[in-house]
């Protein structure tokens, strides 16, 4: 069967759910797709809760690990939705997922209010550059007391203001579960939530005029057709049958031709900044490419190992280190979709860096990463995020 073509008729926005484990992020995602599928059946399909929550690992522990993409449309826009991981161990994935959001829905259970991971996700959203947040106050059907809801709202607004988000951001009272069950009042609450997304997240400005760049998130083989790399196009555009170069991580770059482009299982003639898509590569073996490399217009960007960065070191309460670190500290640096070990050099006269500090540092990575000034990264050790920063100067 020939694949249908993806139609670009509306502005395309990448959105996601973030927030504390068990506050209902995945249920909210499922409710949005169901309510929109019922309201606008010609342009939406409902995604069941267990289709979204589909990583095998998380079934055992009831936590979302992988990042699931679903799509839906309002009358005004087409949305690609990332269900971001909710568990502390998997903040690594939060970093790879959230870097792709034009806005985020922060899901907070009215029964609990903001929890430690709520705070951590908002901090991370700020550090990885999610520009707008609005709030789905979930499980409102379980709280009768208006005063409790008002207190929770105040706490949420304080939390948003702490990270320089709009403290006047919309807070929409929902019950994702009741909406899934078809309760009219709560179905309307999800429609209101999407109206708030349409109104409060501006149409993103895509970096269309720059040369093509797409970080590789995943790689798989289609029997008889070849290797497909998937990711979100960060810059520029690409047509079918154009050549690309794949750079970073490995010692030498590789050139190939893109023989097909797919988005949401539909074939496309071209792809542009903001799209989540798959590129079919001519004559490329799966083992020749890896996550963390980037596909680029040949010669447009170069990989580097040495840079200067401006870094915020997380406090203990934010999930960071309990103790300071010294010169020559060797953590992992997460760029876009991958982590690379690097050695930190502190500025002259700085003996150590305390949790909570802002610091300028130079870094030498053990593998090259395609980067330029302004690129954001997170610093991790083991499962813990210990800092977040951006590249201020390329050294080599």
From Swiss-Prot:
CDD domains: EF_Tu, EFTU_II, EFTU_III. The keyword Membrane does not apply. Keywords: Cytoplasm, Elongation factor, GTP-binding, Hydrolase, Magnesium, Metal-binding, Nucleotide-binding, Protein biosynthesis. GO terms for cellular component: cytosol. This is Elongation factor Tu. The keyword Oxidoreductase does not apply. The gene is tuf. Monomer. GTP binds at residues 19-26, 83-87, 138-141. Residues 83-86 are annotated as: G3. Residues 19-26 are annotated as: G1.
